[in-house]
Every structure is written in C-alpha cells, then in structure tokens.
Amino acid sequence: MYKRQVLFFSLNGFSQDFQGKAYYMSKTTVNMDWMKNMPPDRAKRIKSTMKNALEKNYILDFNSNSSYFEEEEVLEAGGGQGRGFNWMQFMTGPEGGTLHKDLQSNIYTNKKELFGKVFLIKDSITPTKWVMTGETKQIGIYNAYKATITKEVEEQAFSFGRRRAEPAAGSDEENTNPRLPKTRTVETIAWFTPDIPVSSGPSMYGGLPGLILEISDDKTSILCIKVVFNPKDKIKIKAPSKGKVVTKSEFEKIAEDKAKEMQEMYQGRRGGRRNNARVIR
C-alpha cells in the first residue's frame, strides 16, 4: 500500500465547460512464492521486470461529459518489450491501452494492441451498484466519500514451470474433480469527491457523483496524486478511431485463444517434437 501523499491542486474556478487532468499511480501485488526455488540472479531479473509492469503512472483527462485515461509515457532502457506477447499482461490482467468514456451516451472505447494488431473494444458502460457507507476522509483539500461494491472474481493462475498432469478423459479423477473455475469474493473500495463534478475515475471505475480519487480493488491500489483544473493548454478529449472494432466479449475470446496458442507453443518447446532430433528448450 502506498504511503500517504499530499495532493496538490491548481484551481482556476469551475464552469460548465471546465476540464482537468488527474494524475494517478497504480500498484498491483502478486504472489512471489513460485520463485522460491529459482536461481537468485534469475529471480532478481524477473522481479525487476514485474516491478515495471506492476507499478505504473496514469493520466485521466476529463470534462463534464467524457474522460480519457492512458498510461503516462516512460522511456525505458532497451526500448521496452516491444510488440508481441506481453506475458505480464496475461498474468496480471490489467485494463491496458487507452480508455475513452462518453459519459452521456454511456459508451466506452478501449484501444488495445495484441500481437501487433490494434483493437478498439467498444461497448456499453455497465452500471456499478455502489453502496454508500457514509464514511468520509480528507484527501488533499477535498472531502472524500467512501463507496463499496462486492463481486465474485475468477482466480487466475500462471505457471512458468511444468503444468500439473491433466486427468485422462473419462477417468475417475476427471469425473469426480471437474475443472471448474475457482472464484472468491472481492470488495472494491472507492473514495470520491463531489467537489469535482465528474462521474468518472481511473480505468473503468466510475458511476459515482464525483471524481474517484482512490481505489482499492483486491490486489490493486490506485491513488490520485495531483489534479490540475483548466490547464493552459486546452485538452482535446476524443475517442480513439484506428483499429479493428470489437465488443468486449469478442476481444476476450481473441485474447484467450492467443494465450492458449502461446501456452501450447511454450510446452512444445519444452518437450521437443517427436519428428525433430533437436529439443528446443
């Protein structure tokens, strides 16, 4: 969890056509137990890579009608991961890419890249059934109010080693232990301020009567560290337009198929090919 930081605000007054920028930092924690038996130097390299993937900064451009959320650009040594399979994205499952929300039509457009191909995920914003708790706290110069929602999430697993042997089709193990997805209950906590009259927030969070300044969602925490109103350079908020348009469910199916394809390729390299004398590891 973050150490508490002071929020700094630049205020130029509100009007119906006000706009602003909110700066957020996000941190996700993952279980590192799978690295216990790994050589120390290799574990150190992986942890460094994971740190870059799990700790990110974002900017939310907003006005009363729409918002645009994207990761803050950071130059990395070596040019980053480049195009291809982003295994960290499949491991942590973040809402990557850029995200535009039209708060009037209730439509979002999420621009994502997968294996070098650009997709525009366009779908309706699902209303969130927030529960107001009545709790308040001070965040910067603003009174923030607490809202929560409880949901069931499916456990995600990612293995870098050998997979557990699959039960044979029709065997007693398969019949008595069907491979059903494991789920657990997660509470999401949002702190929002009605003093900033924007029904939006970081990533897909929103639907509250004010800008969301802080989110605690299972293993991910998002904290707003700065808000600037009516910046000198006027903000142009537009939905991304280049890419293949798909629905959320269509994109999830594409990503799932690609993940399975990469997993099969990885297993094939580990086990080698029967008709090839050279074993690829």
Where do the PLM segments sit?
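Extended soluble regions of mature proteins
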Residues: 17-281
